[in-house]
Design a protein with these regions (language model features):
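Beta-hairpin (beta-strand-turn-beta-strand) motif
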Residues: 89-91, 142-144, 157-160
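Glycine-rich loop at the start of a catalytic domain that most often binds anionic cofactors/ligands
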Residues: 91-106
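Short secondary-structure capping/junction motifs at helix and strand boundaries
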Residues: 83-84, 107-113, 162-168
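TRNA-binding/sensing appendages of the translation machinery
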Residues: 71-90
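A gly/proline- and charged-residue-enriched helix-loop-helix capping module
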Residues: 109-141
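Active-site environment of non-heme Fe oxygenases that use a 2-His-1-carboxylate facial triad
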Residues: 2-66, 73, 79-80, 134-137, ...
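C-terminal end-helix/capping segment
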Residues: 106-118, 373-381
Length: 381
């Protein structure tokens, strides 16, 4: 892929030339060592896979030592590809996963201001999401609605699903490249405005779009303590009847990589848009072709229509608009979803896989599944 092919004929988005310089290097992974093999999965552009070259090099002690010895090379590959998959190593536990993550980056964080329900496993390790297995999680950069999102993410296949349940990833630099200019220009200029509603402690309301309670997010039932973090994050807030909380904030929609300087699509517009799940499920059903998938797709379309008919957009559980407050049209959100699926990369989990992601370059999501599956996550500051 040449650099010039990444730049539109109109001459806009000059920063994408930097992206091109990174992306064109993907065709030639750095040299495989005698200890660890490096390769791309057939048909995919990412992640780059690291695997032990022999069984005796699959144990945890070897892996942590190899990471320490080759840290600079690993970071170089992460900068270029945006995602590295450690496959074939014997991890075995959440504690060992945490050790590997700390070896890759010692700046792990416990703070989580995202919307998904998660269970804590160790100091820095949580389950990736406790959302129902039939529900898709759209592509997103982790906590992109914050001023300072995590720089890196780590996913661990504690229990790999037998079928489906993949964690697709997408290069956000190519998403920005392929986004029509009438959308990308607006998002880059205005950013995205987010409106989120959180139930209070003990609430039992059911909604497909419901976030976790505010006391779980802020780890306190004291409103004054919650307000301290709200102020720190530059959120506007309003306490609503029934002990509910509304949070409003505006954030950039395109971010520069702190090291590479390359630009990437970086927002939760499709994740928080009411039409996204049903649009996403069209692709899910096309891929999985299950009776359950068809049923969920039809139900999502019905429930979305009812929700839009009887709810104001500003009262939805989660909502995203352009930065000036204008609605992201159904046509625009459909285009955004289509661009992601044009560039999405999907691989099947294997037990003990660790996926290392540059959160400023690569997004992630989740496809529906049936049966056992436990993917764990850790993230940096």
């Amino acid at each position: 892929m040449s650099a010039t092919s990444l730049v539109r004929s109109s001459g806009k988005k000059k920063a994408l030339v930097k992206n091109a310089n990174l992306l064109k290097k993907k065709t030639s992974p750095s040299k495989t060592s005698e200890e660890v093999s490096k390769y791309l999965i057939k048909g995919l552009n990412l992640p780059i896979v690291y695997s032990p070259s022999s069984p005796e090099r699959a144990d945890l002690k070897f892996l942590t030592g190899w990471i320490k010895k080759n840290h600079k090379e690993i970071q170089r590959d992460l900068l270029i590809y945006g995602a590295i998959l450690f496959r074939g190593f014997n991890i075995g536990s959440s504690e060992n996963f945490e050790k590997v993550a700390l070896g890759l980056d010692p700046n792990l964080s416990e703070a989580y201001l995202g919307t998904s329900p998660r269970d804590k496993k160790t100091k820095f390790v949580h389950t990736a999401s406790e959302l129902p297995s039939a529900y898709p999680i759209m592509q997103h950069a982790e906590m992109s609605f914050l001023n300072k999102p995590p720089k890196k993410l780590f996913f661990y296949a504690k229990v790999a699903p037998n079928k489906n349940g993949e964690t697709p990833i997408t290069d956000l630099r190519t998403v920005l490249r392929d986004m029509p200019s009438h959308i990308s220009d607006k998002v880059e200029k205005q950013g995205i405005k987010y409106i989120r509603h959180y139930d209070g402690p003990g609430a039992s309301r059911y909604s497909l779009w419901k976030t976790k309670p505010w006391n779980e997010m802020f780890k306190t039932t004291d409103k004054k303590e919650a307000e301290k973090e709200i102020k720190k994050q530059d959120f506007e807030h309003e306490w609503l009847p029934g002990n509910k909380l509304r949070l409003i904030n505006s954030q950039v929609g395109v971010r520069k990589h702190p090291i590479a300087g390359s630009k990437a699509w970086h927002n939760h517009s499709q994740t928080f848009h009411i039409d996204s799940p049903r649009l996403e499920y069209k692709y899910v059903f096309k891929r999985q072709k299950t009776a359950r998938g068809l049923g969920v797709y039809l139900i999502l379309n019905l429930l979305t229509g009812i929700k839009k008919l009887f709810s104001k957009s500003e009262d939805l559980d989660v909502h995203a608009t352009y930065g000036d407050g204008s609605e992201i049209s159904n046509k625009d959100i459909r285009t955004i979803v289509n661009v992601f699926w044009k560039n999405i990369q999907i691989f099947s989990w294997q037990k003990d896989d660790i996926l290392y992601i540059d959160n400023y370059s690569v997004s992630h999501g989740r496809l529906p599944f049936v049966g056992p599956r436990e993917i764990q996550v850790a993230w940096t500051e």
